[in-house]
Structure formats: C-alpha cells, structure tokens
A protein has these predicted regions:
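Catalytic domains of riboflavin
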Residues: 1-164
Length: 167
C-alpha cells in the first residue's frame, strides 16, 4: 500500500488556520501519529475531538524556555522510557487565571492549554497536579531529539512566523 504525506508547508497552513494535523513518525520508531494543533488556538471542541478520536493521553509539548518560565519540571529524575518522552508533572490552570474549575472537562483543558501558550503566564497561573500533561522539548528541537514533542514545538515555532513566543 502506498502512503502519501503532506508537505511541511501544507501542515503549517493548516496549523496557522487553527486546524489539526496528524504528525507521523518513522515506522522504525513508534510508528504512530499524534494529533497536533497550536495551543493558542485550541478550543474545547478541538480538545473533545482529540480525546474522542485519538483515545490516548493528551499532551501539550512546550519549548524549554516556556517550561522554565512556567516552572514545569521533569516528572522523574531518570526516565526508563526507551523513547525518553519528556514528561513534566500535570497541571490545571487556576480559576483566577483561566476560569478552570475541575480541570477535567474539554473546556477546562482548552483554557489550561491556552494559558500555557500565553506569553505573560507565570507558574502562579497553574495548579499541580492537574489534567493537562506538558512535555518539554529538548533544546535544539529535532536537531537534538527525533520525537513528536520536538517536531510539534518546531512546527509551532516555524508556524508562528514573527509572532510572540508560542507553543
């Protein structure tokens, strides 16, 4: 069976328009696809669709600068994960900063994710533990680690053009 993939330029166009792409990795790695959208554009409807259709763990990849600014630290000191997925602890937006109540609804998760993308957000805007799972991309992105986390962050950085720092 022949597999066809879109170009990076096509993916960037979809992301810039607030859409969702499937980011696939190599058959020799995890051989899976992740649904990716830009955090600043995420809606409750998009979160709901991602949870319904992908039925897996929903994560929010961030660049190392954002992780540092928001105080997102590694979940474990030494990961035994063969792919070294860079999990941090989970968070919810605070009610004061985001209006989040329980954190579990699609509305609350979207608000938390948008706050993570907010360039004025601080650590005080989040409660932990929560229902949103940040992942911290390695410094240098795909040039440093070949993973969905780095690919998603690199696409977001390229896609933002000359806009402010975003996830």
């Amino acid at each position: 069976m022949k597999t066809t993939f879109d170009t990076v330029a096509d993916a960037l166009t979809v992301l810039r328009q607030g859409g969702v792409i499937i980011l696939a990795d190599d058959e020799s790695r995890e051989n899976e696809g992740d649904l990716v959208a830009l955090a600043q554009d995420i809606t409750p409807e998009t979160v709901h669709m991602m949870l319904r259709e992908a039925a897996g763990l929903m994560c929010t990849p961030v660049g190392p600068g954002i992780a540092e600014r928001l105080g997102f630290t590694e979940m474990v000191a030494e990961s035994t994960d063969p792919h070294q997925t860079p999990f941090t602890y989970t968070v919810d937006g605070t009610f004061e900063a985001t209006g989040v109540t329980t954190g579990v609804s699609a509305m609350d998760r979207a608000a938390t994710i948008r706050q993570i993308a907010n360039p004025t957000a601080t650590r005080a805007d989040f409660n932990a533990p929560g229902h949103t799972q940040p992942l911290t991309a390695k410094e240098g992105g795909l040039a440093t680690r070949i993973g969905h986390t780095e690919a998603a962050v690199d696409l977001a950085q390229i896609g933002r053009a000359s806009c402010r720092e975003r996830v």
